[in-house]
UniProtKB/Swiss-Prot annotation:
Domain HTH crp-type, first and last residues per copy: 155-228
Listed name of the protein: Putative HTH-type transcriptional regulator ycf28
Gene name of this polypeptide: ycf28
InterPro entries: cNMP-bd_dom, cNMP-bd_dom_sf, HTH_CRP, RmlC-like_jellyroll, Tscrpt_reg_HTH_Crp-type_CS, WH-like_DNA-bd_sf, WH_DNA-bd_sf
Pfam hit, one: cNMP_binding
UniProt organism field: Pyropia yezoensis
Length: 237
């Protein structure tokens, strides 16, 4: 997982010179914060733990793990906005609106660093390399967000689910003998929540993918056997 962070397009050499050892000692964000004596907090989240924020001027950095970002309206209706993984960030300068709030739910064990946004802005002003790093990071995150919107915009629920499985395999998968195994267990309910469907539909589609041997389940984890064939299922919908 360290490799995923250090090889992202948004990282520059000054923040990733140490590529060995403990993950937190070579994380580009923490390297910069520690070297410049910048205060930050780290939260450890278990699966299904949730961070709520409705008036915040903080930046949250996912050091390791995955989070679902959801907008919760006053009538408790939820809208999934994004699926974030290791190296991604979320948060805003400030939000004051009684009509909604945001929540971030962990779908596996997750470590999140938290820092005041004013501190980030000050660091960008005082350090040109960090400013470039941060701008490139925002561009990278915008591209990922656009890709996620494309996934959940499919008219076909099957296409949404197949696209999501491919995304999870790419961002949170490990190569095994018979395909790519997701690094964590994920319930049908969570999959349905992410793609804006229901558990019954997701269960039916997964059963079909299992029957056609495009995926399998091992130790409660999904294995994508052939990303190419699974992507064909999207094109044929």
């Amino acid at each position: 997982m360290t490799k995923n962070c250090l090889n992202q397009e948004n990282c520059i050499p000054i923040f990733s010179e140490n590529s060995s050892g403990d993950f937190f000692s070579c994380n580009p964000w923490l390297l910069f914060f520690n070297r410049n004596k910048i205060n930050y907090q780290i939260f450890s989240l278990k699966k299904n733990d949730t961070l709520l924020f409705n008036s915040s001027s903080r930046l949250y950095i996912i050091l390791i793990g995955s989070l679902i970002i959801t907008k919760v309206l006053r009538n408790t209706h939820k809208v999934t906005l994004n699926l974030l993984t290791t190296g991604d960030t979320f948060g805003q300068i400030e939000l004051v609106d009684d009509n909604f709030y945001y929540e971030a739910e962990a779908i596996d064990k997750t470590e999140v660093a938290c820092i005041n946004y004013t501190t980030i802005i000050k660091a960008c002003s005082n350090c040109a390399p960090f400013n470039l790093f941060f701008v490139n990071h925002l561009v990278f995150c915008s591209a990922k967000a656009y890709h996620f919107i494309e996934i959940i915009s499919h008219k076909s629920i099957t296409s949404r689910l197949a696209s999501l499985l491919l995304l999870l395999a790419e961002q949170n998968g490990t190569q095994v003998n018979n395909g790519i195994m997701l690094n964590f267990t994920i319930t049908h309910k969570i999959l349905a929540q992410i793609i804006g469907s229901n558990r019954v539909s997701v269960t039916r589609i997964l059963a079909n993918l299992l029957k056609t041997k495009l995926i399998s389940i091992q130790k409660k984890r999904i294995i994508v056997h052939s990303p190419v064939l699974l992507s064909q299922r999207i094109l044929n919908q």
